[in-house]
From Swiss-Prot:
GO terms for cellular component: cytoplasm; ribonucleoprotein complex; ribosome. PROSITE patterns: RIBOSOMAL_L21 (PS01169). Coiled coil: none annotated. SUPFAM superfamilies: L21p-like (SSF141091). The gene is rplU. One of its GO terms (molecular function) is structural constituent of ribosome. One of its GO terms (biological process) is translation. Keywords: Ribonucleoprotein, Ribosomal protein, RNA-binding, rRNA-binding. This is Large ribosomal subunit protein bL21.
Amino acid sequence: MYALVEINGKQYKAIEGEFLKIDKISPVEKDKLEFNSVLLINKDGEVKIGKPYVVNSLIRCTYKEDKKDKKVVSYRYRRRKSSERKVGHRQTYSYILVDEIVF
């Protein structure tokens, strides 16, 4: 059983009992998470598609931890100008455990 859920404007595939890597969430929301913006639910081949969301559906999750992704390095070099720029960025993600999908 899996569901497509919209969290902070992005869509994720949530499977019961598995971890979900989402963009970092605020500390206020970190206790028990419930998302009701479910776009699609698939249970044993039976598919429910929302318009835009599935009515009376919910995904319950548990917050686990925040982690940083690998560093992405951006480098710009301008020839003949003695100009170069190097910038690094590490995106922070939250890992949540999908407890159950209710519909």
